[in-house]
Curated annotation (Swiss-Prot):
Entry EC number(s): 5.2.1.8
Subcellular location: Cytoplasm
Organism: Clostridium botulinum (strain 657 / Type Ba4)
InterPro entries: PPIase_dom_sf, PPIase_FKBP_dom, Trig_fac, Trigger_fac_C, Trigger_fac_C_sf, Trigger_fac_ribosome-bd_bac, Trigger_fac_ribosome-bd_sf, Trigger_fact/SurA_dom_sf
Gene name per UniProt: tig
Catalytic activity: [protein]-peptidylproline (omega=180) = [protein]-peptidylproline (omega=0)
Family: Belongs to the FKBP-type PPIase family. Tig subfamily.
SUPFAM superfamilies xrefs: FKBP-like, Triger factor/SurA peptide-binding domain-like, Trigger factor ribosome-binding domain
All copies of domain PPIase FKBP-type, residue ranges: 163-248
Gene3D superfamilies in the record: 3.10.50.40, Trigger factor ribosome-binding domain (3.30.70.1050), Trigger factor, C-terminal domain (1.10.3120.10)
Protein name: Trigger factor
PANTHER family attached to this UniProt entry: TRIGGER FACTOR CHAPERONE AND PEPTIDYL-PROLYL CIS/TRANS ISOMERASE, TRIGGER FACTOR-LIKE PROTEIN TIG, CHLOROPLASTIC
Top enzyme category: isomerase
NCBIfam families registered for this protein in UniProt: tig
Length: 430
């Protein structure tokens, strides 16, 4: 095998690979063995005609397609390894020369991993990130717990007031016609919750059980449905029942009922501690992100478009998986958000480019600093993943994970170690 390498443009190379005629003939014979049974030649049983007869009857090129594939599968990986070429996508293969008794020559044009010029990555200055737990946040959490433990009872007499729960039947009309999704029976709505559009809920205040009313509202311009966006609508509403919520008192008894604590003060203290922990983790994550962004700003990379497109495709697949868990699909998502595949991909583009750039920088720093994942770290990471799967035999599952996902685990571990290095060497400023 002979290989010539030509730089076509930035991050794109063309390899001209020559396979000697003897090797190519072996590939043709391999192709013949694979396809022999499909050839039907007069005077021979199907699949029994010899190679020289097949070439004569069908022409020598009949076996070239698979022969080309066999040659490329064998020689292309060796060619890129020998020339230290790191492709980011599949190559474009073009045949230069092919024929009986000739060397097989082909070109492989491929986009390569770009050069990363690191700037300063140790000692970057990043603004300190910190959060304080406000008393109001603690009180809001207590109110939320109060709401979850409210007692609900029927309101035997009287009108709907804010804070009441109305059980209603409704049917909506736009342009005088009923629309899909605009009708429900025995629907519970808390007045003042903002569940419905516009002032729908406010217009129910003052109504009594069994009373009906026409409620007039307008859909928001960006409601998410082309047939409803910005349009006025009329709803025929009937009050079936009215319920009232009784909130429990915020006292020591409440704390005992909803938690492991004996006093309200102990419950408040626990809520505050949990919030402090959450905010501390949030501040840490934001600081780490700011450090990486500062390092990225100092680096120079010309990212090939194909890498960004591949990352966008990965992001779309992730979105599709998340939607599937919710019982939805991409088509429904596009309709609901008044979007399209093209719009969503364009929206993802900036994030995709940022991710690719960050990954390349982290890999380059790992290379410069000689940061690697040890076998022990791989095992520990796999054990963590195995525990998340809830498997009984954790060690066996971890072993399978290492074998199947070693490359992904290594990247995760190495990136984590690089991040620790960057944060440890950063300068926190006020």
């Amino acid at each position: 095998m002979n290989v010539k390498v030509e730089n076509i443009e930035k991050n794109v190379v063309k390899l001209e690979i020559t396979v000697d005629s003897e090797k190519f003939n072996e590939a043709v014979k391999k192709s013949f063995k694979k396809n022999a049974k499909r050839f039907n030649v007069p005077g021979f049983r199907k699949g029994k005609a010899p190679l020289n007869i097949i070439k004569k009857y069908y022409g020598e090129g009949v076996l070239f397609e698979d022969a080309i594939n066999f040659c490329c599968e064998d020689t292309y990986p060796k060619a890129i390894e020998e020339n230290n070429i790191k492709p980011v996508d599949y190559p474009q293969i073009d045949v230069v020369q092919i024929g009986e008794g000739k060397d097989f020559i082909y070109t492989a044009e491929v986009t390569t991993v770009p050069e990363v010029k690191l700037g300063e990555y140790k000692g970057v200055e990043v603004k300190k990130v910190s959060y304080e737990v406000e008393d109001e946040a603690v009180e809001n959490e207590l109110k939320s717990m109060q709401e979850k433990n409210a007692r609900v009872s029927l309101k035997e007499e009287g009108e709907i007031e804010k804070g009441n729960i109305a059980i209603i039947d409704f049917k909506g009309y736009v342009d005088g016609k009923a629309f899909e999704g605009g009708e429900a029976k025995d629907y519970e709505i808390e007045i003042g919750s903002g569940t419905f559009i516009g002032d729908f809920e406010d217009q129910l205040v003052g109504l009594k059980k069994d009373e009906s009313k026409e409620v007039n509202v307008s859909f928001p311009e960006e409601y998410g449905r082309e047939d409803l966006n910005g349009k006025p609508a009329t709803f025929e509403v009937t009050i079936k029942d009215i319920k009232v919520k009784e909130l429990p008192a915020l006292d020591d008894e409440f704390a005992k009922e909803v938690s492991e604590f004996d006093t309200l003060e102990e419950l408040k203290s626990d809520i505050k501690d949990r919030m402090k922990k959450e905010l501390s983790e949030k501040a840490k994550a934001e600081y780490e992100e700011a450090v990486v962004e500062a390092v990225a700003a100092n680096a120079e990379i010309e990212i090939p478009k194909v890498m960004i497109e591949k990352e966008i495709e990965n992001m779309v697949r992730d979105l599709e998986m998340r939607l599937k868990y919710q019982g939805l699909d991409l088509k429904s998502y596009y309709e609901f958000t008044n979007s399209s595949e093209e719009k969503v991909k364009e929206y993802m583009r900036e994030t995709a480019e940022k991710r690719v750039k960050t990954d390349l920088i982290m890999q380059e720093i790992a290379k410069v600093e000689d940061i690697k994942a040890t076998e022990e770290e791989l095992k520990e990471k796999a054990m963590e993943v195995a525990k998340q799967y809830g498997q009984k035999d954790i060690e066996k599952t971890a072993e399978l994970i290492v074998n199947a996902q070693k490359a992904y685990l290594e990247i995760d571990i190495v990136n984590g170690k690089v991040l620790d290095l960057l944060v440890e060497n950063s300068k926190e400023i006020a």
